[in-house]
UniProtKB/Swiss-Prot annotation:
The gene is merT. The chain crosses the membrane at residues 16-36, 46-66, 94-114. InterPro entries: Transprt_MerT (IPR003457). Hg(2+) binds at residues 24-25, 76, 82. NCBIfam families: PRK13751.2 (NF010314). Belongs to the MerT family. GO terms for cellular component: plasma membrane. The lineage of its organism: Bacteria, Pseudomonadati, Pseudomonadota, Gammaproteobacteria, Pseudomonadales. This is Mercuric transport protein MerT.
Length: 116
């Protein structure tokens, strides 16, 4: 018996891709703020050429998560997870939380020059 798809995988993929997209700029600032230092922090810039790919993956994953969460679904049978009223509301809350974090992560490289 397989578990129904509910958008969790797309939310996870979108969040991970956004983190990877901003790793070249956000990573060094976070590490320095935590007290880490060293020349190896500069190696995180090796991810910069892949940033557009990660941005695309994040946005596509968020689109599929949005589609899965907000598209009308088939009727739920009693006893299934989707029949519990709090579950769809929780998924929507998590989706918008991840969407905000993705937008922050995607916009951070443009704001980071003001911190250095």
């Amino acid at each position: 018996m397989s578990e129904p798809q509910n958008g969790r995988g797309a939310l996870f993929t979108g969040g991970l891709a956004a983190i990877l997209a901003s790793a070249c700029c956000l990573g060094p600032l976070v590490l320095i703020a935590l007290g880490f230092s060293g020349a190896w922090i500069g190696n995180l810039t090796v991810l910069e050429p892949y940033r557009p790919i990660f941005i695309g993956v994040a946005l596509v994953a968020l689109f599929f998560a949005w589609r899965r969460i907000y598209r009308p679904s088939a009727a739920c049978k009693p006893g299934e997870v989707c029949a519990i009223p709090q579950v769809p509301a929780t998924y929507k809350l998590i989706f918008w939380g991840v969407a905000v974090l993705v937008l922050v992560a995607l916009g951070f490289p443009y704001v980071v020059p003001f911190f250095y």
